[in-house]
Curated annotation (Swiss-Prot):
Belongs to the ketol-acid reductoisomerase family. The gene is ilvC. GO terms for molecular function: ketol-acid reductoisomerase activity; magnesium ion binding. Residues 16-207 form the KARI N-terminal Rossmann domain. The active site is at H131. Gene3D superfamilies: N-(1-d-carboxylethyl)-l-norvaline Dehydrogenase, domain 2, NAD(P)-binding Rossmann-like Domain. It catalyses: (2R)-2,3-dihydroxy-3-methylbutanoate + NADP(+) = (2S)-2-acetolactate + NADPH + H(+); (2R,3R)-2,3-dihydroxy-3-methylpentanoate + NADP(+) = (S)-2-ethyl-2-hydroxy-3-oxobutanoate + NADPH + H(+). It comes from Buchnera aphidicola subsp. Acyrthosiphon pisum (strain APS) (Acyrthosiphon pisum symbiotic bacterium). It comes from the Bacteria. This is Ketol-acid reductoisomerase (NADP(+)). Disulfide bonds: none annotated. GO terms for cellular component: cytosol. Involved in the biosynthesis of branched-chain amino acids (BCAA). Catalyzes an alkyl-migration followed by a ketol-acid reduction of (S)-2-acetolactate (S2AL) to yield (R)-2,3-dihydroxy-isovalerate. In the isomerase reaction, S2AL is rearranged via a Mg-dependent methyl migration to produce 3-hydroxy-3-methyl-2-ketobutyrate (HMKB). In the reductase reaction, this 2-ketoacid undergoes a metal-dependent reduction by NADPH to yield (R)-2,3-dihydroxy-isovalerate.
Length: 490
């Protein structure tokens, strides 16, 4: 039973609204509450391994519990843990003595894993998640004596480790499941866990399981994964239709997302648009307005289906059906013309990605703003909406730069992958019709310089800079820069 749907209206609003930017003084106790405790991480994939490495470096006692057949077959999780000199054993051997059990297995495995863990966990132990799907959407019931918390780094596991090694961290969301906080220690343990992964150095949001799940699902389905996938396929097809070099076209898109979104990290949509000439900026702005208009109903449907639980219900049916839809979509994507395009070995200058990618920039702007706006309209706070619509975008774009959509879909969770395909199935025909009407200069070659109306340009600049995501983004990015400066100075 979907936990969110069991709440009354006021409870739903309070949970979705929960979001507080925590002060650095709140982490003065560091991770003292977890020192000399037995911490067992279940699963040793990207998040499991890299969070564990950080926590060990922070002075905590970390071991890994894996399934017996994973150990016997020496699978990748076992290799990850052993090669990094961690203690590894099965559930029966490690869970009964654990003070904190952190479940970092894939979403679809959570129910069966949690069922086993609950039978083995000692009284008053703490259970941790990094994504709340199992609690919120599946409605998992946890033993009342067990405290349930969440620490969710807002990036892939590899980035969690790399930022920690640089002496910094990644923005992190923490939460306590208030149905399971009988000893009132949840927040202190979550803070200590976030401190140990380095999250306190980049900024921590105190949120709720519900706010994390609903915003996370919306972001990954739309702008973070679904929009990038749809746009990659359609932009490549558009370039081929215009008789552009297939290898150049593929590289422009594959590396273009990463190059362009790098500007988002430093100055948001404003800086991304400022990288264009004035005439190109005006064109990108107008295209973005049109894209927002035609895609707004689809973004709204995804938000509505996430809030109602319809999305999760349909995806869990696919789990029961051996991932039939997911595997079919994965096969289709793997065999698209973009994924199988030839390699372009020449260098494309950085500015060329902007000058030849007006449409790509318009798609990014419209997708970020739509995703953010739909979350805000639903009651999700601006800080959460920013992290789930803009902040993670360069990290996802980086996966496409490595091995196109194959790499993105391999790195993201199965839940994100399913949602991405679902969005793309609907967005593809809508955007295809729109893109077919565009000018050649919108993608693949530079727009010739045109006369610019000063008043029009001024108004466009004002609208870009004054969008709510730019205002909250400026605040959050400045906070991260200050925290990084303090950390480096130490």
């Amino acid at each position: 039973m979907n936990y969110f749907n069991t709440l009354n209206f006021t409870q739903k609003i309070n949970q979705i609204n929960k979001c507080r930017f925590m002060k650095k003084e709140e982490f003065n106790k560091k991770n003292d509450i977890l020192k000399n405790k037995n911490i067992v991480i279940v699963g040793c994939g990207a998040q499991g391994l890299n969070q564990g490495l950080n926590m060990r470096d922070a002075g905590l006692n970390i071991s890994y519990a894996l399934k017996k057949n994973s150990i016997a077959n020496k699978n990748q999780s076992w290799i990850n843990a052993i090669e990094n000199n961690f203690k590894v054993d099965d559930y029966d051997a490690l869970i009964p003595d654990a003070d904190l059990v952190i479940n970092l297995t894939p979403d679809k495995q959570h129910h069966s894993v949690i069922k086993k863990l609950q039978k083995l966990m000692k009284k008053n132990a703490v259970l941790g998640y990094s994504h709340g799907f199992n609690i919120v959407e599946f409605g998992e019931k946890i033993r009342k004596d067990i405290t349930v918390i969440m620490v969710a780094p807002k990036c892939p596991g590899t980035e969690v480790r790399e930022e920690y090694k640089r002496g910094f961290g990644v923005p992190t969301l923490i939460a306590v499941h208030h149905e399971n906080d009988i000893n009132k220690i949840g927040l202190e343990v979550a803070k200590a866990w976030a401190f140990s992964t380095g999250g306190h150095r980049a900024g921590v949001l105190e949120s709720s399981f519900i706010a994390e799940v609903k915003s996370d699902l919306m972001g990954e389905q739309t702008i973070l994964c679904g929009m990038l996938q749809t746009a990659s396929l359609l932009c490549y097809e558009k370039l081929i239709t215009e008789k552009c070099n297939p290898a150049y076209s593929a590289k422009l898109i594959q590396n273009g997302w990463e190059t362009i979104t790098e500007s988002l990290k430093h100055g948001g949509i404003t800086l991304m648009m400022d990288r264009l000439s004035n005439s190109s900026k005006i064109r990108a702005y107008k295209l973005s307005k049109e894209i927002k208009k035609i895609l707004s109903p689809l973004f709204q449907k995804h938000m509505d289906d996430i809030i109602s639980g319809e999305f999760s219900n349909e995806m869990m049916k696919d789990w029961e059906n051996q991932d039939l839809k997911l595997l079919n979509w994965r096969y289709k994507t793997k065999n698209t013309s973009f994924e199988t395009a030839p390699v372009y070995n020449e260098k494309i200058p950085e500015q060329e990605y902007y000058d030849h990618g007006i449409l790509m920039i318009a798609i990014l702007k419209s997708g970020i703003e739509l995703s953010f706006e739909k979350m805000i309209e639903t009651g999700i706070k601006e800080e959460s909406a920013y992290y789930e619509s803009l902040h993670e975008l360069p990290l996802i774009a980086n996966t496409i730069a490595r091995k196109k959509l194959y790499e993105m879909n391999k790195v993201i969770s199965d839940t994100a992958e399913y949602g991405s395909y679902l969005f793309s199935e609907s967005a593809y025909p809508i955007l295809k019709e729109f893109i077919s009407t565009l000018n050649k200069s919108d993608l693949g070659c530079a727009l010739s310089h045109q006369s610019v109306n000063n008043i029009e340009l001024y108004r466009i600049n004002q609208k870009i800079q004054n969008h709510p995501i730019e205002i909250i983004g400026c605040t959050l990015r400045n906070y991260m820069k200050k925290m990084k400066a303090i950390t480096v100075a130490k």
